[in-house]
């Protein structure tokens, strides 16, 4: 099992299991005048880390997946929710290779920008009086 592979790794095991660790920890925070909620897989108070466990079809492409699936937004929100740095522990579904991916300042900044834009869109669609979503379109230059 993939779980067994992760837990057989001493560093992973120490990050996941210790006396100062909480699991499936919920939180709510107000950012950009909207409430955001999340549930962290693991909050490790000893190491001051929020840890998310992910599987991937190809660990060599995880950095691309992290952008495609907005993991930068997740890392930004959860780091603000819990006040700790964010770490992804990833296991390849095919090879069972384990990866640990920490987050650069640029990764958090991209996440912050996406969260800000999402808040702006939410405000437009749900907080703007008489807004007609049928009249909404995006306009870009190629």
Pin down the residues of each PLM region.
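Short, solvent-exposed loop/turn segments at secondary-structure junctions
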Residues: 28, 56-58, 93-95
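Metal-dependent nuclease catalytic regions and adjoining charged, substrate-binding loops involved
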Residues: 64-67, 77-142
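Metal-dependent nuclease catalytic cores that hydrolyze phosphodiester bonds in DNA/RNA
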Residues: 1-39, 135-142
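Conserved catalytic cores of phosphodiester-cleaving nucleases, focusing on short active-site segments
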Residues: 38-63, 78
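Coil-to-beta-strand transition motifs
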Residues: 33-37, 44-48, 84, 95-96
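Short, glycine/acidic-rich beta->alpha junctions
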Residues: 34-35, 69-71
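Electrostatic, structured charged patches in enzyme active sites and in nucleic-acid/phosphate-binding
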Residues: 22, 70, 94
């Amino acid at each position: 099992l993939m779980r067994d592979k992760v837990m057989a790794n001493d560093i992973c095991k120490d990050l996941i299991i210790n006396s100062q660790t909480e699991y499936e920890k919920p939180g709510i925070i107000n950012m950009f005048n909207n409430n955001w909620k999340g549930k962290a897989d693991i909050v490790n108070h000893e190491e001051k880390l929020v840890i998310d466990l992910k599987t991937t079809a190809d660990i060599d492409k995880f950095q691309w997946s992290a952008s495609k699936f907005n993991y930068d937004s997740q890392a930004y929100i959860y780091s603000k929710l819990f006040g700790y740095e964010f770490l992804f522990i990833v296991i390849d579904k095919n090879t069972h290779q384990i990866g640990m991916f920490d987050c650069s300042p640029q990764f958090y900044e991209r996440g912050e920008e996406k969260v800000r834009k999402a808040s702006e869109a939410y405000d437009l669609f749900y907080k703007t009086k008489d807004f007609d979503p049928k009249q909404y379109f995006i306009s870009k230059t190629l």
